[in-house]
């Protein structure tokens, strides 16, 4: 029940594009971040959840740590990417690539795929973020190729960039 609650809360926050963490997640904080606050909110509707989350759990089995949150997000992201991959099939697609710096001043590249769905509508799907060491064209191409290879997307199917 604890893990299910954490997964569902993480899923809701992710699909609503909400931040997970707060500035002060200490026990005395009035707002411990969206993830913890959503778990607390969820527990108000279900006595079973109330009995097994947050204060009522052993310290090593709360399933609320930042590490657990990241693992849940990683699994959700993999599921989304696999769904996008299935949606593309062997069709042609375009890629959009954008560079930015993360909070640790590391350069990262976002890969977005533009596809035409079965109804003929153009869709853009955020697909992946890759940290890159160098932003020269060859290095970026190699990183993109690694991502595409991992998801069995063929470079020959790219029709624009």
Sequence positions of predicted segments:
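Extended, charged coiled-coil/helical-stalk scaffolds used for oligomerization and assembly
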Residues: 1-152, 160
């Amino acid at each position: 029940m604890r893990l299910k609650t954490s997964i569902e809360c993480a899923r809701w926050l992710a699909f609503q594009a909400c931040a997970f963490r707060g500035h002060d997640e200490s026990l005395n904080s009035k707002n411990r971040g969206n993830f913890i606050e959503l778990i607390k909110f969820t527990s108000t509707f279900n006595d079973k959840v109330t009995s097994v989350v947050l204060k009522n759990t052993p310290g090593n089995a709360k399933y609320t740590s930042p590490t657990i949150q990241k693992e849940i997000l990683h699994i959700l992201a993999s599921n989304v990417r696999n769904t996008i991959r299935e949606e593309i099939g062997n069709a042609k697609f375009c890629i959009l690539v954008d560079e930015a710096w993360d909070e640790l001043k590391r350069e990262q590249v976002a890969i977005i795929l533009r596809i035409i769905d079965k109804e003929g509508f153009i869709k853009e799907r955020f697909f992946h973020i890759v940290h890159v060491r160098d932003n020269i064209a060859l290095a970026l191409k190699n990183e993109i190729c690694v991502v595409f290879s991992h998801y069995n997307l063929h470079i020959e199917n790219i029709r624009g960039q």
